[in-house]
Amino acid sequence: MKAILDTHAFLWAIAGDTRMSQHARDIFRGPSDLLLSVASIWEIIIKVQLGKLDLPQPAGPYVLGKLAENGIKTLAINLDHLLAFERLPMHHRDPFDRMLIAQSLEEDLPLVTADPAFNTYSVRVIW
C-alpha cells in the first residue's frame, strides 16, 4: 500500500508509540510504500528549534537516518501541490497539515493520521 505519513504518525511509528492504531502499525511494519513529505521534515525541524520536540540528535540527520532505516521515501512539494493547497477551504489552519492534505489529494494517496481535522477534507485517511 502506498500512503503519505502525517508528521505525528511518522514520529510515533519510529518511537514505537502506543498511540498508533494497530492498523497504522501494521502498515508501517508491512510491505508498504510509505512517503514522508518534505513539509513534515520542515515541521520537525521547526519543532526541534522551538524546543517543542526533543530528538536524540539534530533533526535533519535523525529524520534522514530513520527514513533510510525504515525504507520510507520523501515526497517533494511541487507546483501542483501548491496550487492544490491554494484551492483548499480553510477548515484547518495548520499550514503543514494543509500541505499534506493537498499532496494527498493531488497524488491520490491516503494519509496515515490520527488527526480528526483531516476528515473535513475529501482525503482518504488510514488509522
Language model segments and positions:
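Generic structural signal for small/hydrophobic residues in well-ordered secondary structure
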Residues: 7-8, 44, 85, 104
